[in-house]
From Swiss-Prot:
High-level lineage: Eukaryota, Fungi, Dikarya, Ascomycota, Saccharomycotina
Topology class, membrane: Single-pass membrane protein
Note: Partially overlaps TRP1.
Transmembrane segments: 20-42
GO cellular component terms, semicolon-separated: membrane
Subcellular location(s) of the protein: Membrane
Chief localisation class: membrane
Name recorded for this polypeptide: Putative uncharacterized protein YDR008C
Natural source organism: Saccharomyces cerevisiae (strain ATCC 204508 / S288c) (Baker's yeast)
Length: 116
């Protein structure tokens, strides 16, 4: 209702603006800008005009927060290594124990019958 009144009033002001374009250009332009900003300001305080109530959902069916830990998995109790400066390095016996042969791939369901 108020918006239709404002549009009609602005249309009338534009007609007046055309008649007095040279003499009162800045005053009429300022007044039209003031009326437009005032109409926008009044509509911004009108409830349910800018945001319909259906767009905001206070209760959602999904829990979007992350779980604190993985289920059934916990971190190790301690890390067994010797600290050398800032890095955790393996001991000399662990380095010498490493195998020089190539690794054997794990058995899968597809090749179980072949190896038996």
């Amino acid at each position: 209702m108020f918006r239709s009144f404002m549009l009609a009033f602005q249309k009338a002001c534009r007609q007046v603006h055309k008649q007095y374009l040279n003499k009162y250009y800045s005053v009429i332009t300022y007044f039209l800008a003031f009326l437009t900003k005032f109409a926008i300001l009044l509509e911004s305080f009108t409830p349910f005009v800018s945001t319909p109530p259906l767009t905001s959902t206070p209760i959602t069916p999904f829990n979007l927060s992350a779980s604190p830990t993985f289920s059934g998995v916990s971190p190790p109790a301690n890390i067994k290594c010797k600290l050398s400066g800032l890095s955790c390095l393996p001991t000399q016996s662990e380095i010498e124990f490493q195998s020089k042969s190539s690794p054997v791939p794990p058995a899968s369901e597809s090749n179980k019958g072949i190896n038996e």
